[in-house]
């Protein structure tokens, strides 16, 4: 299966994570907790494409905890209970630390679905990490929110986005052997809207649409291809 560029270069360790220095930089509020493996139940709140899922996976990886993931869009109470039961069984088998249960788009869970998480969080069967693009104060039930710390992720800055582009060209196996000349980045950055995943999707679109040996990335070319793709 041909994975999207964003998935192929997804960071696997904290040192490769781009952006959110206020959380995971040298003085970040999560840095020491991750290093010590003392990760509380928490909510990651931020716009799309800002690294919420990646950060959750890295926290599990670096703290050597089992990692379970659910999407609130496709999961119901039955799925939640099944995963919690698996997490309870794995806890203590491979590690003394409780498993991480990551729920993407947790704001889409109903009250009853969120209620079904309470006992597992309260009794420490799992460490809950929820990701949301919506204000958790309005979308997460008070009983669950009071048991979680909330961390805000920001849209990627210009420097973050450019670093992401250069990392893609340097580290991705499929791009390494291509002669890519990044002449201009303004259109790419503007169209991304601070969304790292969207940036990489557009970048890959432009690269795949170019048949010549040398791939020149210019603002005009980016706009033409994106407009053509949107129309189609």
Label each PLM-derived region with a short phrase:
Residues 186-191, 197-211, 221-224:
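C-terminal helical "lid" of AAA+/P-loop NTPase domains
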Residues 218-232:
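C-terminal engagement/docking regions of AAA+ P-loop ATPases
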Residues 1-36:
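A short, basic N-terminal segment
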Residues 71-73, 149-162:
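Conserved AAA+ ATPase "SRH/arginine-finger" region at the nucleotide-binding site
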Residues 35, 103, 107-146:
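Conserved catalytic/switch belt of AAA+ P-loop NTPases
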Residues 147, 160-175, 205-209:
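Conserved AAA+ ATPase "sensor/coupling" helix adjacent to the nucleotide-binding pocket
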Residues 23-28, 66-100, 111:
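Short glycine-rich substrate-engagement loop in P-loop NTPases that contacts/grips substrate
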Residues 2-3, 32-71, 85-88, 118-123:
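Walker A/P-loop
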């Amino acid at each position: 299966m041909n994975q999207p560029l964003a998935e192929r270069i997804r960071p696997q360790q904290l040192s490769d994570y781009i952006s959110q220095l206020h959380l995971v930089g040298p003085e970040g509020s999560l840095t020491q907790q991750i290093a010590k493996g003392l990760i509380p139940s928490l909510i990651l709140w931020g716009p799309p494409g800002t690294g919420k899922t990646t950060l959750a996976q890295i926290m599990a990886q670096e703290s050597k905890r089992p990692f379970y993931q659910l999407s609130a869009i496709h999961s119901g109470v039955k799925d939640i209970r099944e995963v919690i039961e698996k997490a309870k069984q794995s806890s203590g088998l491979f590690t003394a630390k409780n498993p991480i249960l990551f729920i993407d788009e947790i704001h889409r869970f109903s009250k009853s679905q969120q209620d079904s998480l309470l006992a597992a969080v309260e009794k420490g069967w799992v460490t809950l990490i929820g990701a949301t693009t919506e204000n958790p104060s309005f979308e997460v039930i008070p009983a669950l929110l009071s048991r979680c710390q909330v961390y805000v992720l920001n849209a990627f800055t210009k420097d973050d986005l450019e670093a992401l582009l250069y990392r893609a060209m340097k580290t991705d196996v499929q791009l390494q052997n291509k002669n890519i000349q990044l002449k201009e980045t303004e259109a790419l950055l503007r169209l991304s809207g601070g969304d790292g995943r969207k940036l990489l999707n557009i970048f890959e679109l432009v690269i795949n649409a170019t048949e010549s040996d040398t791939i020149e990335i210019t603002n005009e070319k980016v706009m033409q291809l994106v407009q053509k793709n949107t129309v189609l």
